[in-house]
Amino acid sequence: REAFTLHSERFLGMLADMDTLLRTRSEYSFDRWLTEARSWGETEEEKNQMERDATSLVTIWGADGDPRIFDYSWREWAGLINGYYLPRWQKFYTMLQQHLDEGTSYEEAGLPQIYGREAFRANDFYHALAEWELSYVDTYGKARIPATEGDEIDIVKRLFKKYFKLSQEYYTDSIKLIKPSRDERTYENLGEDL
């Protein structure tokens, strides 16, 4: 149980860190995507519809309550990770933790499949998750202002230190520091011990 908690929390933290890093760049911004979509509407009703359609396109990929190719248009965008994918993973890990606490197993073998993956409402958990996902699509005003935030170089340096140290716990024999090339502006891994 302790290992499950440790590794699931690390994974969730990685998603949050990814969102923080991506938020430094407007081209990776779900917030910008939503703001631009809303700008196409003239009335509040039209703006909400544009936001709903823009959200649906990159999440459930459909307008109905039982999409067949959900997650088809997955995007690793700031705002979408933090607001959509991270909460989904939190819900999944919470459900698994409940099974661990109760001493019951969780099986996905035999669940209804669509295109090689669990169907949108394959079991009670996925049904509840689907309801949350549909609710997310129907929520308006999701865009964070400003759409970009933070200094990407400072964040990269901080995350490199964090994840290099962490990677050594997982890959003790294969991780080596990267050595600056001659021009000191690019980096290459020469496979040498430093």
Language model features with spans:
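Catalytic domains of carbohydrate-active enzymes that cleave complex glycans
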Residues: 1-194
